[in-house]
Amino acid sequence: MADSALLIVAASEQDANLYYATHFWAPDSFIFTQIAGKKILVMSDLEVDRARAESSVDEVLSMSRLQAQAKKKGISPAGTTEVLDILYKERGVQKVEVPATFPVALADRLRDKGYTLSIRPEPFFPERSVKKPEEVAAIREAIRCTEEAINSVVQVIAQSEIRGDELWLQGKPLTSELIRKAMHLHLMGADCLGRETIVAGGTQACDPHCIGSGPLRAHWPIVLDVFPVSMKTRYFADITRTVLRGKPSEKVKTMYRLVREGQEIGFKMIKPGADGKAVHQAIMDHFEKNGFHTGEVNGRMQGFFHGTGHGLGLEIHEAPRVGGVKDILQEGQVVTVEPGLYYLDAGGIRIEDDLLVTAHGCEVLSKYPRELVVGD
């Protein structure tokens, strides 16, 4: 017997740690606990058979059977707290580690039953950041789908007509909404789901998380930041390209060159043992020494004011970080490198690729061309 357990009570559809531990996808909350290395699910009658067939855990218990046990002991109705109490008493558990997102009311009720609860800091499963070969394969597949979706709309932008300072297609202004919808439809055809996909032009692109709206401008950069999830594997890809239809200004051309160079700095530095903070600082320094400064100007942040990258997997943003905080990279992690420059008089430039940290450096998993000007 072990006197301690891990516990997550959530819906795996919304909790990547829970899905990672169980490989069971469900929209409603269920109980996962790990005792002495043994993974256990407690499932409703609706899901118990599917969980036994699909999950990767060691044991699947019936919620209704545990409730029946509680009723024999005079406990009725028996909810999650009472069911866990029966299970933990049977197995000698006294201490429980939970994630920071654990429901407060349930935590209070378990403490009232005499259990000692503590929060296990993220990463809840430290091994999750180092990807197994099958996880890397899943990310590669999501990347290929993403690149195809990006290519489909880059061709549309390249074929658009320049009318004044706007792009037109088939007699109508070409809008962020039309491009986003086209990408989402392409992704759906490949069993991927795109949400909040960024198609931002003009000064909208100076806000890195603005998804973009309205007509797209000629001669200004258009940021395409695409981060779909595979509905088959549940793994994400995350790729950004910046394109322009028309004639870029000299400032935009310089910004694009510097961002590409910043990416190359990241590619060369990323390897096992590298500090994500040092990678980020090297790119910041490259921009600064070339005269592209970061700070607030007339009430708006301009320059390079976000992190260089983040881990990628079952979540779009997960450990490790490549930014302003020390984080040592390990072989097998998948990270993004996505420097950017943003100025209201020129627009936004961001280029993002996904990298696998290898034994002696990194492999760039995303291969889509990095070209600013598209079309004739």
Roles of regions detected by a PLM:
Residues 1-376:
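Active-site neighborhoods and metal-handling regions in enzymes and metal-associated proteins
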